[in-house]
Amino acid sequence: MISFIIPCYNEEKHIRECIRSIKSNIQYIQYEIIVVDNNCSDDTAKIANEEQVTVIEEKRKGVVFARQAGYENAKGDLIANIDADSKITKGWVWVALKQILNDDVIAVTGPLEYENSSSSLKLLTKIFYWAANISNKYVGVFLQGGNSMIKKSALDAVNGYDLNIAFYGEDTMTAKRIQHLGKIVFEPDLISISSPRRINEQGLVKTIWLYLINYLSVTFKGKSLTNDYKDHR
């Protein structure tokens, strides 16, 4: 059984499409969708309920707390982490299962593609994920937090997520904590289409810099450098 976990903070503009992209991918597979209401003040929970999925609340603000709440309530043996402002692409589930059902694989992750992105952003995104794939093989493990599937047994072995990292680097820390249990595969065909809102509002250079320095810090020092983050809605 696959448990799809979607952390949400005021995602009324995106959550319906996100949920429906998951449902359209499911055939002949047991699954559940858990939307984690992380202090929403809009209609996110109402819309999720209309879509007939499980909605739970997590009052501690932050994506890592929402992921942990989803994991603790999940019934499946596979945990799929999906960002609320994303839509998984056709065939996503089967691409993920092809990798993660191997005995030596504990997690699979893939790239994000951004809606209505410029040619320069598309090029930089391709370069980023090329570098991420190289890093995953030779430097440090790479995990795209909002576009991944993890065996629940691997998370059970480390008691879930590290709650000391609020945002930047939380996915890298997850990868770092479970990597001794098996392989983490970067699968280029495991694509999720995401909103570019953070890049648009924060700027491309700053966004890349913040993710890069925190990835390196968590990989080599075991801690994040940036504790503060801004919600972009």
Residue ranges and their predicted role:
Residues 167-174:
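Acidic donor-binding loop at a coil-to-helix junction in glycosyltransferase catalytic cores
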Residues 91-120:
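Conserved donor NDP-sugar-binding/catalytic core segment of glycosyltransferases
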Residues 79:
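Short aromatic/hydrophobic "clamp" motif used to bind/position activated sugar donors
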Residues 109-117, 121-145:
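Short, flexible, basic/aromatic active-site loop/helix in glycosyltransferases
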Residues 20-30:
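Short, acidic, metal-binding catalytic loop of nucleotide-sugar glycosyltransferases
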Residues 58-74:
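Glycine-rich, basic loop-to-helix element that forms the pyrophosphate-binding segment
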Residues 37-45, 86:
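A conserved acidic beta->alpha catalytic loop
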Residues 14-16, 42-50:
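Acidic helix N-cap motif at the loop->helix transition within catalytic regions
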